[in-house]
UniProtKB/Swiss-Prot annotation:
Transmembrane segments: none annotated. Its EC number is 4.1.3.27. Mg(2+) binds at residues 364, 501. This is Anthranilate synthase component 1, pyocyanine specific. PANTHER family: AMINOBENZOATE/ANTHRANILATE SYNTHASE, ANTHRANILATE SYNTHASE COMPONENT 1. It comes from Pseudomonas aeruginosa (strain ATCC 15692 / DSM 22644 / CIP 104116 / JCM 14847 / LMG 12228 / 1C / PRS 101 / PAO1).
Length: 530
């Protein structure tokens, strides 16, 4: 069928093809295989049934939005993106310094009022306003337009008084979002597939219409998602770690002194594992096979790739119901396996019982449930907060977790970005009280965390937000994958076990990277023989 054409407010239109519902990976489309930077995949699955909920693939982008402190840079990636810069220049907030330089629009936001009360600070002008302005410019009466991207852990220092880390080098922006040019959106619950092209520069119509037709033809002709298997017999043995077990255990002991002194009740230190990764996409596919999780994501930003399979949502907001939700995870045990590495059901159940009866784990989890309730109290209507699925156990490839779900109705004057600002960073990656815990983490961890512990997901012009915490993930730069993992520390934590927990959490990703490297080596050897 021919593409339907929908108007987009003031800045062009979109072309849309409704396709037969298929469970297809973007790799089946040549534009994904051939594309370079500025593309993203975000998959959501049901925790219990493992059934897919939604898959969004930004196949190509026209505008890239980066935030570094008070500076937001909107960079046009082609003529289609350039057509957006003029209306965005006109929509620049009055208190913001705006500079247009060719394909780049630079907005500098004023310093936040540090002495304002909490409600005024929440409503104050911040760099997050740039995302609202972009979505407002793209607003579509015929259906929401979305952005896909990343909030880093270090975005928090724009809103809270955090010390500078010992290592001042920064590699990851406070946030990075992409405005899609070509988008594949699969609603698995409604069994509906849509392929969309957004035309902001009329001169680019023919190019985008042709790309849309090509993708639609490929989509119809491609085979369904192949039943791949994880590479067998792989162990992640050649990784390096920035803190060895003994050093990490000593760090845990120093942080326990702060717990003892009453500075914090809980804190979540982390360490970084690294190993070579020549093919991030292949490593991502291996991770999904080995560690099927509710959120799976792949972001190619050009200067780095980020991929992961995360068990934990960051913040979800449904604009229609106005429900905002957090999903704290705290309390971990390894999966029960026999000598061959297969799941031993009896041992697995014993480990679950041990987890459910562990007073330290229960106390740690309830502390973070209370923190989530307190975070939502800042932005929700009074009397609407509730805790669901209290102390449920979710199982993943290498570990099992205690989880709960905390929800409430967002205050009528606030939106999803207000809610995210109030709740960042998620307590399960920080500790409690949150600000003091973040300050101590800056003091004891060497550098910026970057993507780890932040959030990745989609935000649309209707106001919806769906994000995953960036954990069980790898940030790949210059052929090296860095996998960060943390552990919740309380007064009676065993430092040795906390070091072991970080390793267990990192192993799913490290093993996937090792499997991808072996797969690549075997493929190269086969081609050499051929």
């Amino acid at each position: 069928m021919g593409a339907r054409r929908w108007l987009v407010s003031g800045v062009g239109y979109r072309l849309e093809e409704s396709l037969e519902y298929r469970t297809l990976v973007p790799e089946a489309l040549s534009i994904w295989r051939m594309a370079g930077a500025n593309r993203m995949l975000f998959d959501c699955f049901d925790v219990d049934s493992k059934a897919a909920r939604r898959s969004v693939a930004i196949l190509s982008s026209c505008l890239r939005i980066e935030c570094w402190g008070r500076d937001v840079v909107l960079r046009a990636l082609n003529s289609n993106g350039r057509a957006l810069l003029a209306p965005l220049s006109e929509d620049c907030p009055a208190q913001v310094t705006c500079l247009r330089d060719g394909d780049t629009l630079h907005w500098r936001f004023p310093q936040e009022e540090s002495h304002a009360d909490e409600w005024r600070r929440l409503h104050g002008l911040s760099s997050l306003e740039a995302l609202r302005r972009v979505l407002g410019t793209l607003g579509d009466a015929e259906g929401p337009v979305l952005l896909g991207g990343l909030f880093s852990f270090d975005l928090a220092e724009q809103f809270e008084p955090l010390p500078a880390p010992a290592e001042p080098a920064r590699h990851c922006p406070d946030y990075l979002f992409l405005v899609p040019e070509l988008l594949l959106d699969i609603d698995h619950l409604a069994r509906r597939t849509s392929l969309q092209a957004f035309v902001h520069d009329p001169a680019g119509h023919d190019r985008l219409a042709a790309s849309l037709r090509q993708c639609a033809d490929e989509f119809h002709g491609a085979v369904e998602e192949a039943s791949e298997s994880p590479v067998a017999g792989v162990r992640a043995g050649n990784y390096q770690v920035d803190l060895d077990d003994a050093s990490f255990a000593r760090q845990v002991e120093r942080l326990q002194a702060h717990v003892r002194a009453g500075d914090v009740f809980q804190i979540v230190p982390s360490r970084s594992f690294s190993m070579p990764c020549a093919d991030p996409w292949r490593a991502y596919r291996q991770l999904c096979l080995r560690n099927p999780s509710p959120y799976r994501f792949f972001l190619d930003a050009g200067d780095f790739c980020l991929f992961g399979a995360s068990p934990e949502s960051a913040l979800k907001y449904d604009a229609e119901s106005r429900e905002v939700e957090l999903y704290p995870i705290a309390g971990t045990r390894p999966r029960g396996r026999d000598a061959r590495g297969a799941i031993d059901a009896e041992l697995d159940n014993r480990l679950e019982a041990e987890l459910r009866l562990d007073a330290k784990e229960i106390a740690e989890h309830m502390m973070l449930v209370d923190l989530a309730r307190n975070d939502l109290a800042r932005v929700c209507r009074s009397g609407t907060r509730q805790v669901r699925d209290m102390l449920k156990v979710d199982r993943y490839s290498h570990v099992m977790h205690l989880v709960s779900r905390v929800a409430g109705e967002l205050h009528g004057e606030l939106d999803a970005l207000h809610a995210y600002r109030a709740c960042l960073n998620m307590g399960t990656l920080v500790g409690a009280p949150k600000v003091r815990a973040m300050q101590l983490l800056r003091q004891y961890e060497d550098g910026y965390r970057g993507s780890y512990g932040g959030a990745i997901g989609i935000l649309d012009s209707a106001g919806n937000l769906d994000t995953s915490i960036v954990i069980r993930s790898a940030e790949v730069r210059e052929g090296i994958a860095r996998v960060r993992a943390g552990a919740g520390v309380v007064l009676d934590s065993d430092p040795r076990l906390e070091a072991e927990e970080t390793r267990n959490k990192a192993l799913a990703v490290l093993t996937a990277v090792a499997a991808a490297e072996r797969e690549r080596g075997e493929r190269d050897a086969h081609h050499a023989v051929g």
